[in-house]
Amino acid sequence: MDEYAKIEKIGEGTYGVVYKGVHKATGQIVAMKKIRLENEEEGVPSTAIREISLLKELQHPNIVCLLDVLMQDSRLYLIFEFLSMDLKKYLDSIPSGQYLEAMLVKSYLYQILQGIIFCHARRVLHRDLKPQNLLIDSKGVIKLADFGLARAFGIPVRVYTHEVVTLWYRAPEVLLGSVRYSTPVDVWSIGTIFAEIASKKPLFHGDSEIDQLFRISELWGTPNNEVWPEVESLQDYKNTFPKWKGGSLAANVKNIDKEGLDLLAKMLVYDPAKRISARKALLHPYFDDLDKSSLPANQIRN
């Protein structure tokens, strides 16, 4: 830890305090995440350290780079490249009645998908995507942060400050207790984030797991085996759920054109097996008029 100096506390993440810091030798500004774990007496599990070390290999222009993993007094510090603004703060800063330019919405979504494809190709899920862990710079680049941390540390029910971890972006299969979920959980989250980038308000803002599920059901109709084979056998599915018929996506999401709504609907399909993949989403006509040559990862390398 002697190589780095803390400058100031900049926030509290899911797993602990985040500081702005500096690498003393080079002057590089970094983000330092101090990880606090539920059962701290036992120290940091070696499995977590192994998982985290693998994340150093996730190098892509749309993924926040993990520069270093350090231990000090049995505390784990993750050192990341520093970006000063997250998507949530940015959306909150836009004056009432104003929205992001349609082309910037499109560019952000395309870049988020590029980042997720890179990780999914390496069998790394995010599991906890939300506007707070999408970081942006002043040049229109967006990067995914906190990749793989959910697998290394688990997703706690509460942030260590006792603030409840948000459920707004969580896929229905996770809410219903599926243990065999995969890459489609991230696509669902990205769909809900897409709607929020365009309209500046969360698409489904439940305050508990059941409320979250009901808000999704009000829009899409209550899921059953007909639309989603075997959903009724998931552990948290109840036959007593209210039977909603479902409404219209266009009525609930503002500032997205017809092509965008078509893509969004495909990202929010109930059945994970029928939900569009991130790779297929990139080929959707919604992106036809986006100038991809200027994007930082315009050549995706697998």
UniProtKB/Swiss-Prot annotation:
Gene3D superfamilies, A to Z: Phosphorylase Kinase, domain 1, Transferase(Phosphotransferase) domain 1
The keyword ATP-binding belongs to this UniProt entry's keyword annotation: yes
Record field: catalytic activity: L-seryl-[protein] + ATP = O-phospho-L-seryl-[protein] + ADP + H(+); L-threonyl-[protein] + ATP = O-phospho-L-threonyl-[protein] + ADP + H(+); [DNA-directed RNA polymerase] + ATP = phospho-[DNA-directed RNA polymerase] + ADP + H(+)
Coiled-coil annotated spans: none
Modified residues (Phosphotyrosine): Y15
SMART domains: S_TKc (SM00220)
UniProt domain Protein kinase: residue ranges: 4-287
Keywords: ATP-binding, Cell cycle, Cell division, Cytoplasm, Cytoskeleton, Kinase, Mitosis, Nucleotide-binding, Nucleus, Phosphoprotein, Serine/threonine-protein kinase, Transferase
One GO cellular component, as annotated: centrosome
Root EC class: transferase
Residue sites binding ATP per the record: I10, G11, E12, G13, T14, Y15, G16, V17, V18, K33
Main location as per UniProt: nucleus
Record flagged with keyword Transferase: yes
Active site per UniProt: D128 (proton acceptor)
GO biological process, one term: G2/M transition of mitotic cell cycle
Localization of this protein: Nucleus; Cytoplasm, Cytoskeleton, Microtubule organizing center, Centrosome
EC code(s) of this entry: 2.7.11.22, 2.7.11.23
UniProt xrefs under InterPro entries: CDK (IPR050108), Kinase-like_dom_sf (IPR011009), Prot_kinase_dom (IPR000719), Protein_kinase_ATP_BS (IPR017441), Ser/Thr_kinase_AS (IPR008271)
PROSITE patterns with a match to the protein in the record: PROTEIN_KINASE_ATP (PS00107), PROTEIN_KINASE_DOM (PS50011), PROTEIN_KINASE_ST (PS00108)
Residues the record lists as Phosphothreonine modifications: T14, T161
Highest taxon, organism lineage: Eukaryota
Post-translational modification: Phosphorylation at Tyr-15 by wee1 and wee2 inhibits the protein kinase activity and acts negative regulator of entry into mitosis (G2 to M transition).
PANTHER family, A to Z: CELL DIVISION PROTEIN KINASE, CYCLIN-DEPENDENT KINASE 1
Function, in words: Plays a key role in the control of the eukaryotic cell cycle by modulating the centrosome cycle as well as mitotic onset; promotes G2-M transition via association with multiple interphase cyclins. During G2 and early mitosis, CDC25A/B/C-mediated dephosphorylation activates CDK1/cyclin complexes which phosphorylate several substrates that trigger at least centrosome separation, Golgi dynamics, nuclear envelope breakdown and chromosome condensation.
Oligomer status and interactors: Forms a stable but non-covalent complex with a regulatory subunit and with a cyclin.
Protein's recorded name: Cyclin-dependent kinase 1
Native source species: Rana dybowskii
